[in-house]
Amino acid sequence: MPLPPSAAPDPIARFRDALARAAAASPHDATAAALATADARGAPSVRMVLVKSADARGFAFFTNRESRKARDLAANPRAALCFHWPALEEQVRVEGAVTPLPDAEADAYFRSRPRESRVGAWASRQSAPLGDRAELEAAVREVEARFPGDEIPRPPFWGGYLVAPERIEFWRSGPGRLHHRTVYVRRGDGWEVGALQP
């Protein structure tokens, strides 16, 4: 299959264009992606995250660093992301190594979040067992009492991660399930691009 005309040399620019089209077509959580990780034994797990930026460095997301995904990444610092936009009949898959983002970037993003989300970040011990909902609600009240104003610092157990892409695949639905697939593979400072069978 020949390369489609949209096979631009820069996959990040192509992704950002697709994301803009997805946000225009269906603005609710266009940045949502399935994040797949695996623990030290290779046991996989997957969950949805919101990707907050995509640039030449990679794809950034933020989370509790005591969560299952964070434990997986500490043991096995590789991950895959999958964005699926039904309104466009397109998806993008990203694979690569994962590193923690600098604290300054995590601080800046944390400050931009709504107050209730910052409170929730302190109150939730993500992925830990929960006895009942009242336990979590009590933790929220404790955090609100501790930080009565709008200044809520970033918890030391909360931060960001960067997926540095080594492989990015763009998929677009085709008639008769003859879909269009273009893959970019990192080669040094550039990208090797090619088409895949559907």
From Swiss-Prot:
UniProt record similarity statement: Belongs to the pyridoxamine 5'-phosphate oxidase family.
Binding-site residues for FMN, renumbered to this chain: 47-52, 62-63, 68-69, 91, 126-127, 171, 181
Function summary: Catalyzes the oxidation of either pyridoxine 5'-phosphate (PNP) or pyridoxamine 5'-phosphate (PMP) into pyridoxal 5'-phosphate (PLP).
Catalysed reactions, semicolon-separated: pyridoxamine 5'-phosphate + O2 + H2O = pyridoxal 5'-phosphate + H2O2 + NH4(+); pyridoxine 5'-phosphate + O2 = pyridoxal 5'-phosphate + H2O2
Segments traversing the membrane: none
Database matches in Pfam families: PNP_phzG_C, PNPOx_N
Single Gene Ontology MF annotation: pyridoxamine phosphate oxidase activity
GO biological process: pyridoxine biosynthetic process
Complex formation: Homodimer.
SUPFAM superfamilies: FMN-binding split barrel
The keyword Oxidoreductase appears for this protein: yes
InterPro entries in UniProt: Pyridox_Oxase, Pyridox_Oxase_N, Pyridoxamine_oxidase_dimer_C, Split_barrel_FMN-bd
Full protein name: Pyridoxine/pyridoxamine 5'-phosphate oxidase
Primary enzyme class: oxidoreductase
Protein EC: 1.4.3.5
Cofactor(s) of this protein: FMN
